[in-house]
Amino acid sequence: MADASRLSANFPPATAEAWRSLVAKTLGDKPFSDLEKTTAEGLPIAPLYPPGDLPGGQAFPTRPFDSERPWDLRVLTAHPDAARANIEILGDLEGGAVSAVVRIDPTGQAGVAVGSAEDLALVLKDAILELAPMGLDAGFLGPKAADWLGAVAKSSPGAKLNFHMDPLSAFAEAGTSPGPIESHVISAATVGARLAETYPHGELFLASGRVVHEAGGGEAEELAFAAAAAITYAKALVRAGLPMAEAFGRITLGLAADADYFVTIAKLRAAREIWARIATACEADPTARIEARASRRMLARQDAWNNMIRMTAAAFGAAVGGADAVMLGTFTDAIGLPTAFARRQSRNAQLVLMEEAHVGRVADPAAGSGYVEAMTDQLARAAWAKLQEIEAAGGLAAALASGLIARDVEAAKAARPEPKLVGVNAFPPAKEHPVEIETPAPKSVEAPSPALPGPDSACPALKAIRLAEAYEAAQ
């Protein structure tokens, strides 16, 4: 007798061969390949994923499950004025954010004008560091900014600080480093090892692949870059005195979350698989810690209101993919600094997914999906092959200097099909409705130079792009 508790038990067994036979009748003279598609990155999409064709069982641990607060809602402040940046952070925390990142730029052109611990203290005034983790995005100033943050938090040794030094991303984006890039990695590791003694919960390095994504690279290139950066930083921390297991435990992976949420889901799951493989070989914790930031290359200036939907799709993909922290930015980021309204919309997009849609109530909800499992496996394999190429070239710094990374990014960019961008080259508005942005007065401060002794390093720069830019310029 059929088991009434299983719906499938009430139907005769189906096979892939029987399904394909029926499809052939429908297709007639057309080839079966007409049903096969590819993603924008060239990954194959099959019309059906029979259970027998799925990759093996899950090879990676997911993030620790917490149904009440499934991920860290993280915000970024880049307002040049320190006092205004402080107001933004406190407002975000009161509005539902869990943590914040301060982008530092002493010139005030691309971040908060901070040049000392005193400046940073003003930015973080009244923030309770034991409850609200604070992080940094400081480029080559990372080690100095990390010391500033450590000084600001000296009365809060239990604070979970995200120092997130990442000199390799700064090098890749700028195409040069003020002094040898190897010295910058060593300097960051030395500072990190010292701070690790005082802040046992601090995250020292951010091994981010987003610079590859923003320059037009594919998912495999982004994953390989992040993994290679993690290996470089772990080795540097070990040389600075940390045990291997602790070194890996102090590194966070940084990845981009795109509006193509299936790709985002698969990419984050593939990142966990790659991390587990590397960490297990080094006898470290195989559970990756991932910070997902919304892609900036997907944003449009024209009909920018659509960016809200793009951001929400990115947040959904990051959450379902298992990100530990999600930072969206705002829908006006392609135009200028956000208003309080734009910041609130960004927070609320995540809060609705978390509190109303209950996206985080299930651990790894995409597990078992043939499409997602196959894409996860394909991305992990492709990224692993590229990681081996990077390591064979001498590591990430050498691969950047040789042009290997830039060539891979350019090849991926050239192979990408023309995108369809709603409000730009598809369904443009009859009338543009401008968005409001902040236009602050210029602000800059004196700051120590990030330069280190020795000749500057150079590499082909990975310059950020926006997919909509060419279409907007043509109109």
Regions found by a protein language model. Give the residues of each.
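Catalytic-core signal marking the mid-to-C-terminal active-site face
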Residues: 2-3, 18, 344, 348-475
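Mobile "lid/hinge" segments at catalytic clefts and subdomain interfaces of large enzymes
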Residues: 201-234, 309, 315-316, 320-386
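A glycine-rich phosphate-binding loop feature that marks nucleotide/adenosyl-phosphate handling sites
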Residues: 37-44, 166, 208-214, 247-257, ...
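Catalytic alpha/beta active-site cores
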Residues: 1-260, 282, 287-291, 319, ...
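Glycine-rich anion/phosphate-binding loop at the beta-strand->alpha-helix junction
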Residues: 227-230, 253-346
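General structural feature for long, well-ordered alpha-helical segments within catalytic domains
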Residues: 15, 19-22, 42, 85-88, ...
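Conserved, mostly hydrophobic/aromatic
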Residues: 42, 96, 153, 275, ...
